[in-house]
């Protein structure tokens, strides 16, 4: 068998063994995709014992390409929400998550200086302790750029594997410990979250209001500031028994019922100006109006602002809200449409059908992947990651590398959405498939390279010490920030658990947090809020640590 055939066969075996290990769960928690790393270590041990020779060049290419696929698809997935998560709505959660990253870096630096841990080893421990595989790839990339021998670079994968198991268990232990320390009643926390969940004003709500302010009588909607802005949408108006779709020129009268869509704070302001909330239904049932959800798939409308499409003037149809990448938004007239946006339309059936034709609404297109934008994005990301930045006093030029470059480019392209007829939307199933393929390839090679000396290092070497160092890097930031968030910020326990899981970019921890109260979405919401920024910082941090440690010796 040729070296290439043998290498591919061994990688396939690693994937099978690793995915099987990852699917084994104890009380609902398993290693997940991290099991591939340990599958690689097991197979790598026996490959080394058997004296087999694999193609090192091929393994290197597969490892790097897998990493590129993984970080690129992550960037495309979180891009639409990345910059939004930096705004005020998620500022507090993101600040606590960033603090966890910073404390983890400080603990790593202290351990490195106190115990004289080799640079590749301490970076591997750091990456494993925070269960972040892209951080491992980014660290290995910068070490190679700094001229570190390959044998030393491979040690990073081994120390990563030592620290990884407690990285998963440590966050679960932290959640349990904080629950005991603060005597948390999970049911009470869930009820409190449900009663106050505004996510900084990010959730979209509807309200029916009766016009009671005499100053508004016989005014057109466009002349009422609270209704003429982009924060509140009036999608229906009921006068006596007639339900209609209002336009900016529609004149409102005392006693009219308005169906408003917006964020809770904005709806409250509208209520103060217009009148009291009423329980009267403004349902379209039994009327000549209906509500429909339509998907944007027509390339001709991509990048166009809602106001420029003139749906209200041409078709008497109102867009009441917009869903982008799972996030509900008020359909502001200044919003530019992106491929895959889901619009809530209110209007007559024939008019809605006409608008749907303009927008596309071709469900089959959502399952298709445009491969040209994928490779354009990957290519641009690799180029971005290869740009050297020379800083006086540093031994090597700083680069984003094959982990940082594709990630940042994907974040930017995911946020832009489309350029002309090129759109970077990727169906969730396709995104997940490419992401899983990439991480399986990457971890398979890392495990194979680490497997030969893993047992020896664990039993006869410094493996146990590495596990201890990793436990400190995992536990100290989580416990510290968890206590601060609960005591100082009075953060909801379920929200805090999601934030802790997101700060470690750890899906098994999110699964555990979700199971604390299966019907509450608090943990998932906070996890999604901090995940994009933290993923970016986790990839950049080992590179900064590597250059810092290298420069100060």
Swiss-Prot record:
Keywords: Cell membrane, Membrane, Repeat, Transmembrane, Transmembrane helix, Transport. Residues 191-276, 279-361 form the RCK C-terminal domain. Its main location: membrane. One of its GO terms (molecular function) is monoatomic cation transmembrane transporter activity. SUPFAM superfamilies: TrkA C-terminal domain-like. Gene3D superfamilies: Regulator of K+ conductance, C-terminal domain. Pfam families: Asp-Al_Ex, TrkA_C. The keyword Transmembrane applies. It is found in: Cell membrane. It is a multi-pass membrane protein. GO terms for cellular component: plasma membrane. HAMAP family: YidE (MF_01016). Belongs to the AAE transporter (TC 2.A.81) family. YidE subfamily. This is Putative transport protein YidE. The gene is yidE.
């Amino acid at each position: 068998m040729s070296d290439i055939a043998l290498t591919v066969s061994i990688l396939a075996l690693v994937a099978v063994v690793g995915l099987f290990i990852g699917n084994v769960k104890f009380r609902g928690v398993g290693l997940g995709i991290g099991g591939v790393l340990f599958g690689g270590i097991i197979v790598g041990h026996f490959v080394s014992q058997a004296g087999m020779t694999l193609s090192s060049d091929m393994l290197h290419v597969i490892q790097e390409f897998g990493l590129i696929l993984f970080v690129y698809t992550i960037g495309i997935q979180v891009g639409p929400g990345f910059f939004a998560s930096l705004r005020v709505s998620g500022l507090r959660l993101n600040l606590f998550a960033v603090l966890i990253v910073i404390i983890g870096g400080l603990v790593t630096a202290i351990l490195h200086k106190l115990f004289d841990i080799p640079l590749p080893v301490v970076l591997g421990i750091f990456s494993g302790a925070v269960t972040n595989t892209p951080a491992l790839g980014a660290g290995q990339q910068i070490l190679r750029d700094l001229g570190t021998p390959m044998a030393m670079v491979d040690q990073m994968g081994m120390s990563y594997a030592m620290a990884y198991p407690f990285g998963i268990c440590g966050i679960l232990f932290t959640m349990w410990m904080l629950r005991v320390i603060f005597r948390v009643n999970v049911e009470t926390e869930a009820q409190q979250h449900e009663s106050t969940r505004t996510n900084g004003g990010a959730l979209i709500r509807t309200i029916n209001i009766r016009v009671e302010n005499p100053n508004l009588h016989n005014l057109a909607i466009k002349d009422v500031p609270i209704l003429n802005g982009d924060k509140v949408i009036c999608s229906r108006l009921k006068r006596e028994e007639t339900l209609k779709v209002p336009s900016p020129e529609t004149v409102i009268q005392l006693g009219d019922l308005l169906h408003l869509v917006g964020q809770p704070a904005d709806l409250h302001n509208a209520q103060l100006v217009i009148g009291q909330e009423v329980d009267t239904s403004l349902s379209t049932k039994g009327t000549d109006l209906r509500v429909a959800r339509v998907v944007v798939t027509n390339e001709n409308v991509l990048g166009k602002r809602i106001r420029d499409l003139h749906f209200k003037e041409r078709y008497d149809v109102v867009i009441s809200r917009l869903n982008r990448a799972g996030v509900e938004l008020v359909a502001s007239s200044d919003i530019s449409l992106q491929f895959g946006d889901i619009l809530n339309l209110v209007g007559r059936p024939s008019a809605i059908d006409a608008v749907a034709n303009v927008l596309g609404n071709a469900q089959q297109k959502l399952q298709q992947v445009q491969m040209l934008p994928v490779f354009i994005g990957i290519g641009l990301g690799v180029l971005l990651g290869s740009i050297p930045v020379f800083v006086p006093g540093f031994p090597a030029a700083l680069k984003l590398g094959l982990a940082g470059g594709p990630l940042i480019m994907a974040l930017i392209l995911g946020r832009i959405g489309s350029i002309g007829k090129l759109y970077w939307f990727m169906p969730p199933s396709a995104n997940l498939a490419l992401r899983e393929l990439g991480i399986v390839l990457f971890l398979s090679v890392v495990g194979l390279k680490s497997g030969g000396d893993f047992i020896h290092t664990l039993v006869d070497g410094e493996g146990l010490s590495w596990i201890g160092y990793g436990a400190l890097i995992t536990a100290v930031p989580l416990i510290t920030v968890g206590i601060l968030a609960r005591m100082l910020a009075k953060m909801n326990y379920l929200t805090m658990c999601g934030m802790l899981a997101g700060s470690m970019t750890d899906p098994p921890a999110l699964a555990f947090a979700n199971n604390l109260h299966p019907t509450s979405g608090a943990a998932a919401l906070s996890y999604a809020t901090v995940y994009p920024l933290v993923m970016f910082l986790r990839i950049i941090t080992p590179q900064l640590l590597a250059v810092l440690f290298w420069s100060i010796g």
